[in-house]
Amino acid sequence: MIAAPFDAVADSTGKKPFYSHLYVQVLAAIAAGILLGHFYPELGAQLKPLGDAFIKLVKMIIAPVIFLTVATGIAGMSDLKKVGRVAGKAMLYFLTFSTLALVIGMVVANVVQPGAGMNIDPASLDPTAVATYASKAHEQSIVGFLTNIIPTTIVGAFADGDILQVLFFSVLFGIALAMVGEKGEQVVNFLNALTAPVFKLVAILMKAAPIGAFGAMAFTIGKYGIGSIANLAMLIGTFYLTSLLFVLVVLGAVARYNGFSILALLRYIKEELLLVLGTSSSEAALPGLMNKMEKAGCKRSVVGLVIPTGYSFNLDGTNIYMTLAALFIAQATGINLSWGDQILLLLVAMLSSKGAAGITGAGFITLAATLSVVPSVPVAGMALILGIDRFMSECRALTNLVGNAVATIVVARWENELDTAQLARALGGQAEESAPAGLQPAE
């Protein structure tokens, strides 16, 4: 159910009761969804519209949030060269860790070999089961992806909710505002004033998060069943463990080097993580993540550039999944890939993960795009993991979210746009207790 406004409900110490916290409500909704989907699968399978409706509500507000954050952030920059530096450093970070994620997935697949011993005849696989994904994969290309960043019309970019197109226009508009100087002050003031109702709307929409998480989880368990995990438990377990180690070890080392704790960051964004877990959509947490990163001391200009771009270029979880799943299919079908074949797979995955970014079902479609170029592994082999992809998509989205949170703090620190004292307070829990739910307009 929709969370009530608990602001007025507090105990004698002035603290809110535990059940008033969004993460508690979402966690309870996820548990309820699992139980309903398991014991009443037919009813659970019919609750998909609840999750879809919530995700659509959030997507409705993503474009205004990105526009206001980026445009006002860049307009307030005294040095426009910073825009290029921030973007360049962000892309360097994305390329480094996205490639590392691909390599880690490949190494783990070779060591654990989750598909070994299955001995599946490739000729027995039904290619029609993945035909839709394969056709979408063939439609993607690097050139097409890059040209598609430029919107045909401004209205079209906002109407379609295309994150990169909205970001592209917002950056140009913010630069134009900064260049006109005093003439643009009234526009900047108007946009800053407009942030209040828009970001208050974000807080209101988040009240519906438990409903969305409940419906999405009930549908997932009701339609696919917990039992469907058992047959491919080795692959699922390997992927979840690899992603967990990537977050705690790799991103943990990056966090430690940059002066903060990955565990403290995970606690800080726990509401966004649970939201992603319940809905299997990282986009559902985008407004909240931008909110949290700005409250954690990252300048708005950095937050507005890094996070939306990272949602297309910094997909650590998706990249781990791509190489791990590709080698699983090869192992399950008895195909022995040489190191040359695997290096080719890695290079193709580096490109296809960018060409298919930002599209619906990106993880599975990107895998199809990669396998269609690598002749050694049959695309039809994707039918083996089609039934469990929904369970793996949650882990992909969670890892992607954490990766973008870490990237934002790191890039902000590189650019000296990070308030380290504010970051320490936020990760220590002080900012979370005092700050409202919506992203705060610039002062």
UniProtKB/Swiss-Prot annotation:
InterPro entries: C4_dicarb_transport (IPR023954), Na-dicarboxylate_symporter (IPR001991), Na-dicarboxylate_symporter_CS (IPR018107), Na:dicarbo_symporter_sf (IPR036458). One of its GO terms (biological process) is L-aspartate transmembrane transport. It is a multi-pass membrane protein. One of its GO terms (molecular function) is malate:proton symporter activity. Coiled coil: none annotated. Responsible for the transport of dicarboxylates such as succinate, fumarate, and malate from the periplasm across the membrane. This is C4-dicarboxylate transport protein.
